[in-house]
């Protein structure tokens, strides 16, 4: 009798101990994914400098064959990997705008002139303004096809309203 009672009490204590340790371990594991107090600021020769002024030497063991993947992206283009190491990420690609040639500048000026003449035609509704605006729109380059179509639609809308003699 006593042996059965002792065995049952030991089993219950073991079950309670196991559940408390699993709950405690899951609570500790969830803390790692929240906001960090220490954030890496720079990396120089495998020495990571953190924002609180501390340093850490990092090394990835040669025998570590687990695949390396990005765990977290920090500020200053610093990547944290699953094995705890840090590296700078790829440099961002900036496309520099090409220098405008004289031909493109002239094409843009023709477009601006056409826009101004169409605006004037919308105000005046005269035949001479229509001729100037239509000629300017016809001279706009094919590279500005969409803008050219918009200008032509604006001219057509004014023509539907009628001209002033």
Swiss-Prot record:
It is found in: Secreted. Residues 1-29 form the signal peptide. Changing residue 131 to A: Loss of host C3d binding stability. Extracellular fibrinogen-binding protein that plays an important role in virulence. By interacting with the alpha chain of fibrinogen and its derivative fibrin, enhances a non-functional interaction between fibrinogen and platelets and is responsible for repression of fibrinogen-dependent platelet aggregation. In addition, assembles a fibrinogen protective shield around the bacteria which results in impaired phagocytic clearance by the host. It holds the Pfam family efb-c. Gene3D superfamilies: Sbi, C3 binding domain IV. Its main location: secreted. GO terms for molecular function: complement binding. It comes from the Bacteria. This is Fibrinogen-binding protein. Keywords: Secreted, Signal, Virulence. GO terms for cellular component: extracellular space. InterPro entries: Efb_C_sf, Extracellular_fibrinogen-bd_C, Sbi_C3_db_domIV. It comes from Staphylococcus aureus (strain Newman). The lineage of its organism: Bacteria, Bacillati, Bacillota, Bacilli, Bacillales. Interacts with host fibrinogen alpha chain/FGA. Interacts with host complement protein C3.
């Amino acid at each position: 009798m006593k042996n059965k009672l002792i065995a049952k009490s030991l089993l219950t204590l073991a079950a309670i101990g196991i559940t408390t340790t699993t709950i405690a371990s899951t609570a500790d594991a969830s803390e790692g994914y929240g906001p960090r107090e220490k954030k890496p600021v720079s990396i120089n020769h495998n020495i990571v400098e953190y924002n609180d002024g501390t340093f850490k030497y990092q090394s990835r063991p040669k025998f570590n064959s687990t695949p390396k993947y990005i765990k977290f992206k920090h500020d200053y283009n610093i990547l944290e990997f699953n094995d705890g190491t840090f590296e700078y990420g790829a440099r961002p690609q900036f496309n520099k705008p090409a220098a405008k040639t004289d031909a493109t500048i002239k094409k843009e000026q023709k477009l601006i002139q056409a826009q101004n003449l169409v605006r004037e035609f919308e105000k005046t509704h005269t035949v001479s303004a229509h001729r100037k605006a239509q000629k300017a729109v016809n001279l706009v380059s094919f590279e500005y096809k969409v803008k050219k179509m918009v200008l032509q639609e604006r001219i057509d809308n004014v023509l539907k309203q009628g001209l002033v003699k």
